[in-house]
């Protein structure tokens, strides 16, 4: 239940500046314990989980809107569009702009 609650929180707040340390400590857990056990439950670290949610939502926005990549980065929770593009490329194998071109 604890990790389902965390996953739900991350899904609902993926576009905010989520600090794993603050999340864990506000629930009376050490950061290392939370990360280790979240990974056992989900198969991924909390930050990887959040990144995956953000990239999936960015992908949907690229498919369904004409928003600029910089705007999409901001919408899904990244202040730095370059960092967002690198993460997107790492997960999807192409840049956000290339992904959008492939859809046409």
Predicted regions and their residues:
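Short, contiguous hydrophobic alpha-helices characteristic of membrane insertion segments
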Residues: 87-90, 102
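Short linear Ser/Thr-Pro motifs
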Residues: 30-32, 65, 85
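Charge-rich, low-complexity intrinsically disordered segments
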Residues: 23, 29-31, 35
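Core residues of bacterial helix-turn-helix
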Residues: 26-27, 76, 88
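Short hydrophobic/aromatic patch on the recognition helix
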Residues: 34, 38, 83-84, 88
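Terminal helix-turn-helix DNA-binding modules in bacterial transcription factors
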Residues: 7-8, 12, 16-21, 40-82, ...
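Short, small-residue-biased leader/transition segments that mark boundaries at the very start
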Residues: 1-2
């Amino acid at each position: 239940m604890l990790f389902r609650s965390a996953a739900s929180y991350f899904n609902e707040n993926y576009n905010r500046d989520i600090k794993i340390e603050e999340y864990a400590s506000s629930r009376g857990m050490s950061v290392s314990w939370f990360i280790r056990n979240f990974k056992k439950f989900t198969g991924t670290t909390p930050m990887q989980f959040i990144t995956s949610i953000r990239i999936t939502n960015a992908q949907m926005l690229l498919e369904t809107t004409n928003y600029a990549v910089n705007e999409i980065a901001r919408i899904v929770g990244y202040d730095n569009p370059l960092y967002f593009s690198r993460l997107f490329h790492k997960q999807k194998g192409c840049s956000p702009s290339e992904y959008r071109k492939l859809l046409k």
